[in-house]
């Protein structure tokens, strides 16, 4: 491999750029707005909601599958809709953001475009300063899928970052207080009924954090874990369907983070769900239909899922067989799981949305994310690994111009940001594809300090900068 010891680096950098085998493509191919993103099916399967560009801003479009009609719900000209989610069979929640500054707002609207509710006003921030002084700081804790009229939110009134819990009506916007913050809880974990059962508590600038737990709505809060903020990870991820077993991600006693089952009553680990010596575990995947945790996501050479539930593993295998060579994610599903939406994408393809009937096992194409991109004209992103001078194994990705001999190519080394925490991943990257289209080889290295490879790998980058 040409990058094994960088022996050809000087030659590559001094070589002139030759004409690419594929045509030079317009900038819009790489950097124009996607034609569609975040396609979501309603719980009953009647509606499809998506984001599409209108007025050079991302707006909401809803398709009524029963009536065969299509309707644009928003007409943003200054702001972008950045995320959507179904709150019940016919009501959609969405977040709004203004370009050029950090900002947020949360709204709900009917699938026919009626009854717009402002669940959280648009709040503009400049750095850490709130520009328009909101009455409250607001965060969504649980969408309460079994309560079609309400969501669970955290609202801070007067205490920085420390919110109390409220049930909010998604039509009237009204709040009903559910619980006062038991201390300094900054984030919550609910069980599968929507009851807050775990909280991560930390005082301002305190060196330690506590994980609090309660057995039920009337039970006292008890501390089940205490750890240093800059120490080993111990993160509660969510409950299983029995609302007793807690899943936690931790790297205690190891370098990479693993996922375990945990008994919060006995306060002990009960089993290992996923552990890898090279890569950190990601998050758990919960199936509302099966009412259990079914898998674990993680970032290896390519994004992957470790399935622990046989039914889901078989379904994923069938999908991958129908769409080979792609990253195939189930991004939305009906409540009964009879219909699922798949986003199928790769290093050369920004993606296509498919609809799968899981009863008949029939797959149909819905929409491509970006019609301007021809995957055949894009370059492959190859996972690579090599040892540094001190013997540390490094991982990365090499992208070579499509249709070119891998000889005499100018090389761009494109490091990710950070330096600690982020990493590069196998995906469609417009910037990398643009450079490859212009005739450059591009090397992305997950250098020491990058995230996803365990604590020791990140710590190997400490005091190595400047």
Regions found by a protein language model. Name each.
Residues 57, 256, 350, 363, ...:
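Internal amphipathic alpha-helical segments of the cytochrome P450 catalytic fold
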Residues 372-466:
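Cap/lid segment of the alpha/beta-hydrolase catalytic domain
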